[in-house]
């Protein structure tokens, strides 16, 4: 009997091992691992690419692709886009410094797009702000085909250059930063539409949405952003942590958000400016607006500035904030709690509440003469709305696939185990 029990124990042990190894099915993001775990969840399957010091050697970023790279503390790195003469192209660069690094107030990432003749198509930069807390930040570049833009209209190679804004600034450490790059294209419209931004919209500051808060845990990156829709959402956030949420906003709809940071009973006193930073990014991960919420241990809140409804013609606006609201899709809310909060009030966690309002009925958008890349990035689907209501990303069946793989492996091994047990039992009876 002892022999039979030992054999079964070995089989069940092997079953447990097989199950444990079968469950994690998500791919690991490409690129070398750093000594300190990254605070950012890179896209599964992101392709590793090394930026070139010269545009002559710049690696290609294919439209619709996601890439992982790195940015040295000094100098520029370049990448190439091969574009046609009719599509708008966008590239987002998310810079991820190590949590152990230090940054200056104005340090950040700068993204420039130029054509093969050296003409500048766009420039954008994002900084860490007064809290000087290292965290993932994103800047975007673009090549637009627009009646008001005479440059960068030719087909051919265009170059994306990425650099630090203030690598030598006081308090900035010389560490290299990880990068996530996403290249996108937006097709031209089938019909000629307005060539000026809408002149009138409701710019009154809306009242924060009321109601009981529902728990919704934030994601750790753009691709893993937790879907939410209109509502009051709460999560816990720790100093140095960054949380990502995705809100579907359709054509004609207007988003407004208030962020609240709850009080603490630590008894400590002090003040951290812009302790909670909330940034709204558009579907191309372009910066739309942000708000900083200071913290003295008591509850405090802040709201994004009033924003116009999403409209294709917003791209013709003179202000970058309005121009960024140029397409429908998932708008990202990225919340970061400054590391400095821990110095005064401890490691937390601290309760964070997001009051999200999406006003207006969805309207018909422009008729595009083709598909965007990635497909569907500039639209809101029924699946997107369902995902926002349920809090699970559309098409995210990772957990189910893990369960299926684990279940099949476990079931098969158990059947084998029971079969062996039966054989051993019969042999024992025969003896």
Region annotations inferred by a language model:
Residues 88-100, 255-264:
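A short beta-strand element within beta-rich, extracytoplasmic domains
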């Amino acid at each position: 009997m002892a022999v039979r029990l030992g054999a079964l124990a070995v089989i069940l042990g092997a079953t447990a091992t097989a199950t444990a190894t079968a469950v994690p099915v998500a791919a690991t993001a490409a690129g070398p691992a750093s000594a300190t775990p990254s605070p950012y969840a890179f896209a599964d399957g992101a392709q590793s690419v090394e930026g070139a010091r010269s545009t002559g050697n710049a690696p290609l970023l294919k439209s619709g692709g996601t890439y992982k790279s790195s940015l040295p503390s000094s100098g520029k790195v370049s990448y190439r886009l091969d574009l046609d003469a009719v599509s708008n192209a966008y590239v987002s660069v998310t810079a991820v410094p190590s949590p152990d690094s230090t940054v200056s107030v104005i340090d950040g990432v700068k993204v420039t797009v130029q054509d093969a003749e050296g003409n500048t198509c766009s420039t954008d930069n994002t900084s860490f702000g007064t809290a000087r807390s290292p965290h993932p930040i994103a800047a975007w570049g673009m090549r637009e085909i627009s009646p008001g833009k005479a440059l960068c209209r030719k087909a051919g190679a265009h170059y994306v250059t990425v650099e630090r804004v203030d690598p030598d600034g006081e308090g900035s450490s010389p560490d290299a930063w990880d990068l996530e790059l996403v290249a996108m294209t937006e097709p031209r419209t089938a019909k000629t539409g307005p060539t000026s931004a809408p002149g009138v919209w409701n710019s009154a500051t809306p009242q924060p949405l009321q109601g009981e808060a529902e728990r919704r845990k934030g994601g750790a990156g753009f691709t893993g952003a937790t879907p939410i829709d209109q509502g009051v959402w709460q999560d816990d956030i720790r100093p140095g942590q960054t949380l990502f949420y995705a809100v579907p906003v359709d054509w004609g709809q207007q988003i407004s958000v208030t962020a609240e940071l709850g009080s603490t009973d630590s008894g400590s006193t002090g003040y951290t400016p812009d302790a909670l930073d909330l940034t709204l990014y558009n579907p191309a991960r372009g910066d739309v607006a942000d708000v900083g919420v200071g913290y003295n241990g008591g509850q405090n809140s802040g709201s994004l500035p009033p924003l116009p409804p999403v409209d294709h013609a917003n791209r013709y606006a003179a202000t970058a904030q309005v121009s960024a609201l140029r397409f429908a899709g998932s708008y990202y809310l990225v919340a970061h709690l400054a590391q400095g909060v821990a110095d005064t009030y401890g490691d937390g966690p601290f309760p964070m509440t997001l009051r999200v309002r999406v006003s207006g009925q969805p309207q018909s958008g422009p008729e595009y003469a083709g598909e965007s890349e990635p497909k569907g990035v500039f639209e809101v689907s029924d699946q997107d709305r369902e995902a926002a209501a349920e809090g699970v990303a559309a098409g995210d069946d990772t957990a189910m696939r893990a369960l299926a793989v684990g279940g099949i492996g476990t079931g098969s091994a158990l059947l084998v185990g029971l079969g062996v047990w039966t054989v051993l039992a019969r042999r024992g009876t025969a003896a």
